[in-house]
Amino acid sequence: MGSKESINSKKIWLDLHMELTDNNYETIIKNNENPVFIDFYSPTCGPCQMLTKLIDTRLEKYGEEQGVQVVKCDISKNPKLASAFKIRSVPFTIAVLKDETLKYPEVGLKNETYYFELIDKLAGKGSFLSRLFT
């Protein structure tokens, strides 16, 4: 029975790996027991597309392994969230902790290591690079 519960928990986690929208904000952010990393983007933004590719190919899976929800939000389709987070430039990333505290707001594309180390911080672990060399 324990393994079935694990599978059900995993299924819920995977079901929530989706685009953050004006409509599902409550479900993903307010009801989440894990920190959430949000990437606000525009489909017409070149640097945003680079970050989206990183999220889709590697960062989302890494976040899941570390217990951090990684989501994206298209500001052109979600004006309420863009307004609530006062988005003026993209890409804009921010973390929402379990208690809904906002941390680590960043505008612009950072290097890949930055995002992996931020996931580590949110998970309460040492840096990604330090774990590679120990």
Q: What are the roles of these predicted feature ranges?
A:
Residues 44-51:
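Short, thiol/selenol-centered motifs that function as redox-active sites or metal-ligating centers
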Residues 19-21, 40, 52-59, 64-80:
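Thiol-based oxidoreductase modules, predominantly thioredoxin-like and allied folds used
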Residues 89, 94-130:
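Non-catalytic, surface beta->alpha helical segment in thiol-disulfide oxidoreductase systems
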Residues 31-43:
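Short active-site neighborhood of thiol/selenol oxidoreductases, capturing the structured segment around
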